[in-house]
Amino acid sequence: VTITFVTIRTLDAPLAGFALSFALELSDHISWLLSKYAKLELDANAAERIVEYTQLDQEPQSGIPVPVYWPSNGEIEVTDLCVSYGPDLPPVLSDLTFTLRPGERVGIVGRTGAGKSSLSLALLRCLDARSGSIHIDGIDIAQVRLHDLRSRVGIIPQDPVVFAGTVREVLDPFGQHDDSELLDALTEVGLLRSEDGASGPFSLDATIIEGGRNLSQGQKQLLCLARALVSRPKILIMDEATASIDMESDIRIQRTLRQVVRGCTLLVIAHRLSTIADFDRIIVLDGGRVVEMGTPGELMTIEKGVFRGLVQESGESVVIQQMIHGNTIEL
């Protein structure tokens, strides 16, 4: 079309109309070509990811057998732990050493990038130790079969995993528990009330869409907490589970942790410091190392301490200090 207008000095009306009609069609073809090229790029990225997944090393399935009741106490002993995301990458956790006593409630705090979530991954062997060890009830988890370890340690991640199906199937996918246990768990986390009956939104036969798209973020977290309560693990890890939920759901989770979760070792990686202000101990991470450890009251007495600084910057300083000093906030 451009060549036609440039080479022909005098252009009558019919020829001009003919050229313009082709110009309109050309723009449609160019638009179609660009959209196909963009789709090709997306497909190429998807194919590249699939190839990467096929080349990943499979996790080892071997390991020593453990007693059926393991862990029976919930003691966690971390010794000189060093962890990285790859053999050629710098460590994200270095020389970590601490012991969690059975039934103890411990909060893990620190600034972004301190290594808090990496610790939870190491406890489940999603990241293998470069050096050092983690023992649960005296057994080195590096020697335990992954299925045994991950099926017996409860975890509630920041991004909850909810499958499609009924509430019953989400709470008990293998059908190992009675309906009464499932109903008790839903009631304990506040998702089910006595007046809801069998037709409530969280009755056992209620439908959950894939990914929990028919639930709020807070409801998904509460459902995951109920699932953990059903299995009654001796160790429960919460990885910033209240970071992105509404205040009402946060209050329900805190009430459950304080009034219902008993007899298990509770490890909470905290986004809101009020979540762990009245816990037995606090472990403060910075740069992948333990920089402070003790009761909340002890850490608040450290001048220019990391935990004290986090409390002062939190915007909830008054509430947190009231909880630390025993003035329980009504939930």
Where are these regions (language model features)?
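ABC-fold ATPase nucleotide-binding domain signature/coupling loops
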Residues: 99, 129, 135-140, 189-223, ...
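Helix-to-loop junction immediately C-terminal to a conserved catalytic motif
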Residues: 123-125
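Catalytic Walker B motif of ABC-type/P-loop ATPase nucleotide-binding domains
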Residues: 236-240
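A short, proline-enriched helix->beta-strand linker immediately N-terminal to the Walker B motif
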Residues: 230-234, 263
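ABC ATPase nucleotide-binding domain helical subdomain, centered on the C-loop/LSGGQ "ABC signature"
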Residues: 48, 52, 135, 143, ...
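Cytosolic ends of transmembrane helices, especially the final helix of ABC transmembrane type-1 domains
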Residues: 25-54
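Primarily ABC-family ATPase nucleotide-binding module
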Residues: 39, 51-104, 111, 128, ...
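C-terminal portion of ABC ATPase nucleotide-binding domains
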Residues: 180-183, 188, 197-202, 255, ...
